[in-house]
Swiss-Prot record:
It comes from the Eukaryota. One of its GO terms (cellular component) is cytosol. It comes from Candida glabrata (strain ATCC 2001 / BCRC 20586 / JCM 3761 / NBRC 0622 / NRRL Y-65 / CBS 138) (Yeast). Substrate binds at residues 98, 108, 137, 226. Coiled coil: none annotated. This is 3-isopropylmalate dehydrogenase. Catalyzes the oxidation of 3-carboxy-2-hydroxy-4-methylpentanoate (3-isopropylmalate) to 3-carboxy-4-methyl-2-oxopentanoate. The product decarboxylates to 4-methyl-2 oxopentanoate. Gene3D superfamilies: Isopropylmalate Dehydrogenase. Keywords: Amino-acid biosynthesis, Branched-chain amino acid biosynthesis, Cytoplasm, Leucine biosynthesis, Magnesium, Manganese, Metal-binding, NAD, Oxidoreductase.
Length: 365
């Protein structure tokens, strides 16, 4: 008998509507081919600028409550110049949902969905080839959630970075879990600024002790964040494995990493509230790119969102095989030359989504 999985869909702003529609199209193809296994129930709600326009707040209570009751959340993108940098901003909805749902771990893979895309990387193919790591970013602590003071006319503003041992232990265990999913286990790289920051010294000490005491079979190496940023351009495969870092450093380094495969439109992400040890962790899934307000309709690449849906199947919905099928379908479509303009292709958003859904049906036939 089919199990019903409830997915809250938060399209958000601008291209968010288009990309979530394509991901749903691919998920529906899974459902069509596995009618006895799964039934997806999609529950749409507002977030970001769209929510501000309709309700005055970036995350309405009903969207948050629905998300808490769901099996997983699929997010499009939030933000845009229309809403500026005023007191109420679209991005506040994203920060709030992360905090309220305790989505403490952000996972952002960086690899090539297909080797046929190597020539699109800003790095030389011989440098970029083989890049394969996951950034595990602590998502609900650090400077983004610390105490702060705005400039109130006195010309002074400040933000504070604070981490506790339990917070660092929790994200370290997530990185260790991800490393142990491979045989042999992947190496772990911990990025910090321990030569300057007290919070980074606590971070480094806690990561080191947690791995040593709880995961002695794993290796962890510490790298200063500025040095890691240089390595990422000069020799990205040196950092292959699992990269663990704090909220702000993770935000920056994962964006730097995201250009290596040639387009932000290729990279998925997952934000988890617990270890996915039974493939049923609650999570929010979204592409790494933003809302692209200047992009004409039909031009956005839906692959990142489709691959985010694949991560959702594998980590939250206990449909690991089906998640891998979506990844295979994406590779098949990209290799066939069906691509959006960011990948030097001529296909529309819906054409790429249609092609992936068709490939899924063929692979599951």
């Amino acid at each position: 008998m089919a199990v019903t999985k409830t997915i809250v869909v938060l399209p958000g702003d601008h291209v968010g509507q288009e990309i979530t529609e394509e991901a749903i199209k691919v998920l529906n193809a899974i459902q069509e081919c596995r009618p006895d296994k799964v039934n997806f129930k999609f529950d749409h709600h507002l977030i970001g600028g769209a929510a501000i326009d309709a309700t005055g707040v970036p995350l309405p209570d009903e969207a948050l409550e629905a998300s808490k009751k769901a099996d997983a959340v699929l997010l499009g993108a939030v933000g845009g110049p229309k809403w500026g940098t005023g007191a109420v901003r679209p991005e506040q909805g994203l920060l709030k949902i992360r905090k309220e749902l305790q989505l403490y771990a952000n996972l952002r893979p960086c690899n090539f969905a297909s080797d046929s895309l190597l020539d699109l990387s800003p790095l030389k193919p011989e440098i970029a080839r083989g890049t394969d790591f996951v950034v595990v970013r602590e998502l609900v602590g650090g400077i983004y959630f610390g105490e702060r003071k705005e400039d109130e006319g006195d010309g002074v503003a400040w933000d504070s970075e604070k981490y506790s041992v339990p917070e660092v232990q929790r994200i370290t265990r997530m990185a260790a879990f991800m490393a142990l999913q491979h045989n042999p286990p992947l190496p772990i790289w911990s990025l910090d600024k321990a030569n300057v920051l007290a919070s980074s010294r606590l971070w480094r000490k806690t990561v080191e002790e947690t791995i040593k005491n709880e995961f002695p079979q794993l290796t962890v190496q510490h790298q200063l964040i500025d040095s890691a940023a240089m390595i990422l351009v000069k020799n990205p495969t040196h950092l292959n494995g699992i990269i663990i870092t704090n909220n702000m450093f993770g935000d920056i380094i994962s964006d730097e990493a995201s250009v290596i495969p040639g387009s932000l439109g290729l990279l998925p992400s997952a934000s988890l509230a617990s270890l996915p040890d039974k493939n049923t962790a609650f999570g929010l899934y979204e592409p790494c790119h933003g809302s692209a307000p200047d992009l004409p309709k039909g031009k956005v690449n839906p692959v990142a969102t489709i691959l985010s849906a694949a991560m959702m199947l594998k980590l939250s919905l206990d449909l690991f095989e089906e998640g891998e099928i979506i990844e295979q379908a994406v590779k098949k479509v990209l290799d066939s030359g069906i691509r959006t303009a960011d990948l030097k292709g001529t296909n529309s958003t819906t054409e790429v989504g249609d092609a992936v859904a068709k490939a899924v049906r063929e692979l599951l036939a």
